[in-house]
From Swiss-Prot:
Gene3D superfamilies named in the record: 30s Ribosomal Protein S19, Chain A (3.30.860.10)
Membrane-crossing segments per the record: none
Listed InterPro entries: Ribosomal_uS19, Ribosomal_uS19_bac-type, Ribosomal_uS19_CS, Ribosomal_uS19_SF
Protein name: Small ribosomal subunit protein uS19
Domain of life: Bacteria
PANTHER family cross-referenced by the UniProt entry: RIBOSOMAL PROTEIN S19P FAMILY MEMBER, SMALL RIBOSOMAL SUBUNIT PROTEIN US19M
Function: Protein S19 forms a complex with S13 that binds strongly to the 16S ribosomal RNA.
Amino acid sequence: MPRSLKKGPFVDEHLLNKVDAQNEKGTKQVIKTWSRRSTILPDFIGHTFAVHDGRKHVPVFVDDAMVGHKLGEFAPTKTFKGHVKDDKKGRR
């Protein structure tokens, strides 16, 4: 079930403060965050976030198509290594 419209989108307060501070200064530095649950707002367009994936911070550049999604959607947590080939020759 989606979030109620009367509540509005969830964004961590510290993340919103960092974006507002950069918008006031006119700078576009990378913002490091562990907040994968924060919703991307229109104020975030043009900023680069370093979103934590459990091991490292993945750079995510926000454009207008990402508005309304969560930051964690663009930093995958699992790396697919491929399926193991069936080794029937070695079992004989």
